[in-house]
């Protein structure tokens, strides 16, 4: 395997986390309160529990205080909103994260929108997403932010490039499309209703897949020397962790590619930590 083709998100994320650790050590040296994140989990979804565990470990490694509040999935929407409002009003909490998905009886959008903008570490509230669309932003949703940071680290040109995104979620596809447009890329967003998907993916200079289907993108769907960013985290038929891209099948054709694991995932966590530190500095008016 030609390792020069690998876009190493784990390595880049460690560089980012080292800088954050350095800044938090300076905060500790001044005997000041360190950045604090509160994560809310409803129920015991296994995937959510794993994601939260990874976030908590990452926080502790860089010196961020991370508290997880777990409530049963019978909690009412009004009770959850009250909990969030209490956190909104707590000056010692810099960032709030509600782990999705939520139970069906709870309106996820209403709950997320309860988080005040200056504590919305995921960047999902309307004000943050609206500013992103206008090109005015200090904070970005974690996964799109991590992807852009990864592309910048590897000096991958965006201006004038045709970027095809598979997936139009509010969490990845839509905000990422806006970021790429702001970087002067030509962007095509494909989704479940796109006809003849391969016609679009075969035109991509950069292909980004966030569709959530194991090994969905095959070699026949891409052109030679494409750069591939795999956002998917899935399990294949043997229960092995894999992305949306059929990695081994496409590897000989690509110019560069992110692996799963070790690509976008670590960058999402690193971007989340950057967002927590940003909100802390805002809260402390540093």
UniProtKB/Swiss-Prot annotation:
One of its GO terms (biological process) is tetrahydrofolate interconversion. Transmembrane segments: none annotated. NADP(+) binds at residues 167-169, 192, 233. Pathway: One-carbon metabolism; tetrahydrofolate interconversion. InterPro entries: Aminoacid_DH-like_N_sf, NAD(P)-bd_dom_sf, THF_DH/CycHdrlase, THF_DH/CycHdrlase_cat_dom, THF_DH/CycHdrlase_CS, THF_DH/CycHdrlase_NAD-bd_dom. GO terms for molecular function: methenyltetrahydrofolate cyclohydrolase activity; methylenetetrahydrofolate dehydrogenase (NADP+) activity. CDD domains: NAD_bind_m-THF_DH_Cyclohyd. Homodimer. This is Bifunctional protein FolD.
């Amino acid at each position: 395997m030609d390792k020069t083709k690998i876009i190493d998100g784990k390595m880049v994320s460690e560089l980012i986390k080292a800088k954050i650790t350095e800044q938090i050590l300076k905060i500790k040296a001044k005997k000041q309160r360190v950045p604090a994140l509160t994560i809310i989990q409803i129920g015991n979804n296994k995937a959510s529990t794993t994601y939260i565990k990874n976030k908590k470990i990452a926080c502790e490694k860089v010196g961020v205080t991370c508290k997880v509040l777990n409530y049963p999935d019978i909690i009412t929407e009004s009770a959850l909103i009250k909990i969030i409002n209490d956190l909104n009003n707590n000056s010692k909490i810099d960032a709030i994260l509600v782990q999705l998905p939520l139970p069906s009886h709870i309106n996820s959008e209403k709950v997320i929108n309860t988080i005040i903008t200056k504590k919305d570490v995921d960047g999902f509230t309307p004000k943050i997403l609206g500013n992103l669309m206008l090109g005015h932003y200090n904070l970005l949703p974690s996964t799109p932010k991590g992807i852009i940071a990864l592309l910048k680290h590897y000096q991958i040109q965006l201006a004038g490039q045709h970027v095809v995104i598979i997936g139009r979620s509010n969490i990845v596809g839509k905000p990422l499309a806006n970021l790429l447009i702001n970087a002067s890329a030509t962007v095509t967003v494909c989704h479940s209703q796109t006809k003849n998907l391969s016609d679009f993916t075969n035109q991509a200079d950069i292909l980004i897949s966030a569709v959530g289907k194991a090994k969905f993108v095959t070699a026949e769907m891409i052109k030679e020397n494409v750069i591939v960013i795999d956002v998917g985290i899935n399990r294949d038929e043997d229960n092995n962790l894999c992305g949306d891209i059929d990695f081994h099948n496409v590897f000989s054709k690509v110019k560069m590619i992110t692996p799963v694991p070790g690509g976008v995932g670590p960058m999402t966590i690193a971007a989340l930590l950057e967002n927590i530190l940003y909100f802390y500095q805002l809260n402390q008016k540093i």
